[in-house]
A protein has these predicted regions:
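Short glycine/proline-rich, acidic loop/turn segments that cap or connect secondary-structure elements
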Residues: 259-265, 290-301
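Conserved catalytic or metal-liganding residues and their short signature motifs at active sites
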Residues: 1-239, 244-246, 281-286, 290-298, ...
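Conserved SxxK-family serine transpeptidase/carboxypeptidase catalytic domain
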Residues: 239-281, 286
């Protein structure tokens, strides 16, 4: 009888152990199927975090991860940040990562930005900072002065590219880190090239922003840059249409008429000699280099080609330029482009 009771007891223990193993195993053996970032927001509730985990990791894997967080009494909802759950991680290890793991870097990629307001909005959509908090700094003269900039030139620090930040980075630290990358770009060789042109890095960026708006053709940017450098050297007004459009603020314009050239603005290079107070867009590194390495030529006039290829006709004389301009205007009229 005792032997029978012992066998039954051992069987129950064995069955219980197997059942426990079958229950526990998925928490250690199931694997996350792809790299996934979990974002934990300030003041996030436990329920909200559970919902986010299930949404990003999948219902089943997410439930198991949330269960392990409860078992571990992790209180991960208090750990504001972005945490990478790598491909192949189990629910248990995913929970431990959310409990103790360090933040992962978040990619911030930007290009084709014109205004500081647009830039601040892009940043706020990717990183955990309010648009207005960053914008307030970038429009503050004292803050800009710390970097040797003004609110008109502060955009030169932010060069379109791919960067990595902690999601929780503060606005001041964000600008500091971007300034670090800016200084890496402006090495001794580039500074020497700018000096040889008689320009500061800010002036190079300002000229490059005009060049970038003048032509989308990267292989033409150096040639356009040299044309403007020739004008600066001979003390001619730049007379760059993009500066007039920037002053007007209407980017739907395709034709610049004589009355628009009278727009009262320090950015209007038809009215004022030299470069405007700052860039008219955030400038690509390749365009900065196009200015610094602009090939020599004697052109001082240019006009869009009448075939609408995006390239320009260049001229050394005003009469040649007028002939180029007439052909282009004739084609505008033929196509019915009035503004």
């Amino acid at each position: 009888m005792k032997r029978r009771i012992l066998i039954i007891s051992l069987s129950i223990v064995a069955i219980a152990s197997i059942a426990a193993a079958l229950f526990i195993a998925p928490f250690f053996l199931n694997k996350n199927e792809k790299d996934t970032i979990i974002y934990i927001y300030p003041d996030m509730t436990e329920v909200a975090l559970e919902d986010s985990i299930k949404a990003r990791l999948g219902e089943d894997f997410g439930k198991k991860t949330s269960f392990m967080l409860k078992v571990l009494d992790a209180k991960a909802y208090n750990r504001t940040g972005a945490y990478l759950i790598p491909n192949g991680l189990s629910p248990y290890k995913a929970a431990r990562k959310l409990q103790y793991g360090g933040q992962t870097g978040v990619k911030f990629i930007f290009n084709n930005v014109r205004f500081v307001d647009n830039f601040a909005e892009r940043v706020s959509k990717r990183l955990l900072m309010e648009k207005d908090d960053l914008l307030t700094l970038l429009k503050d003269s004292a803050f800009c002065a710390k970097y040797g900039k003004t609110p008109q030139t502060i955009s030169t620090i932010f060069q379109p590219d791919s960067y990595e930040f902690y999601w929780t980075v503060k606005p001041e630290d964000f600008v500091d880190r971007m300034y670090h990358f800016y200084n890496k770009f402006w090495n001794e060789e580039r500074l020497a090239k700018a000096k040889a042109l008689g320009l500061t890095p800010d002036e190079v960026a300002t000229l490059a922003s005009i060049v970038e708006d003048e032509t989308a053709k990267r292989d033409e940017r150096g040639k356009v840059a040299r044309l403007y450098l020739n004008r600066i050297k001979t003390r001619m007004k730049l007379q760059a249409d993009p500066t007039v459009i920037y002053a007007i603020g209407d980017y739907s314009i395709r034709r610049v008429y004589s009355y628009t050239l009278k727009t009262d603005s320090p950015y209007n290079t038809y009215l004022h000699f030299g470069l405007p107070p700052g860039p008219i867009r955030f400038v690509e590194k390749s365009t900065l280099d196009a200015v610094l390495n602009a090939p020599s030529h004697n052109y001082i006039y240019m006009c869009a080609k009448e075939n609408f290829s995006g390239y320009h006709n260049f001229a050394t004389s005003y009469s040649e330029h007028k002939a180029n301009a007439r052909r282009y205007q004739k084609e505008l009229n033929r196509r019915g482009i009035k503004r």
